[in-house]
Amino acid sequence: MDAVSLQLILGRASGLRYGQLRSALESISSRPIDIFAVEALLGKRSDTLQSLGLGPAASAWLQAPDAATLAADRYWIARNRIQLLDAFDPRYPPLLTHVRDAPALLYVRGDIESLSLPQLAIVGSRAATLQARLTAMQFAAELSHHGLTITSGLALGIDAAGHEGALRAGGRTVAVLGSGLDRIYPAQHGLLAARIAARGAIISEFPRGTVPLRNHFPQRNRLMSGLSLGTLVVEAADKSGSLITAQFALDQGREVFAIPGSIHNPLTRGCHALIRSGAKLVESTRDIIEEIANSLPKQDDMSRNSSPKRVTRRLATLDKGHKILLDALGFDPTSVDALVERTGFPSESVASMLLILELQGTVGSEAGGRYVRLPDERPG
């Protein structure tokens, strides 16, 4: 049987973990443990497979894989350029090999090599405030300039802002799904997902046709933290799913960072709880870089105390919308709400444009979520 067929069989073995699989193979196979060793499990009685430590669902499937389902899966991966990454492959993310319940197979759309680059997970509330989304975008952009790939879950709010910040800064980003790669969730992020695949990867441990069920998201979260050197929580209520990701990170021996907020905002209580429990309080990207600097790629003229490089462009290169926003901003500190009122632009558009202008060095941010236009640089 060829490698792709065996990989597709693994992908349909519900709940199968790499550790379980390897242990079972070592019990019955004398050949080297690789993807081809999996064939030794096929057709064995379900109770025999369970006695080797595999779960009931995985055992039942391995006893009698459905040929029609596998044929449809093979057609799907070929048509949609889906890559299969089994845990025996040397390209399997090295940090995931240290996660106790790492999946036996990942479905990947995009660049597999992105999964082995240094990553930082950015997570937070789906119903995040505009200021928190701006913060997530800014942190993602600046961390990208330090060589970090930004990993998140494609959800509304902070997840999307983290992906967007990395993309707008020309960086890499990875989205981990709680569904099959054919079921982008939420559906409105279809275009964002395509952009992520072009600048990184979208991955899932779930096979084609898997819908985004509630219990899938903790599984997704443990992959996000498992791929990453650390997890940054930008804004989270006291029962946010982001806290699950943070707990996975702690259990996996990874760093946890949290951005504090107003004591009057219920969406910051989760971050404050993390800080009280030992997470590092973060006020700038420098606070993160100094903790993980030894794991980052070396870059010329960059030290752990340096500020992220900014993309500097002349005002003449800005489009009409950005110029309107700059004119509305002026040189006095101004809130996002005021800019929305002055320009008539949607708040999301203002947020995105402010991020670009800040990366270009034409806008600066101040305390309280206010922005100010910076003097245009002139030669000499």
Segments predicted by a language model, with ranges:
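Short, small/acidic-rich helices and loops at N termini and domain boundaries
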Residues: 1-91, 336, 360-380
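Glycine-biased, small-residue-rich flexible motifs in mid-sequence functional cores and linkers
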Residues: 1-4, 15, 80, 84-380
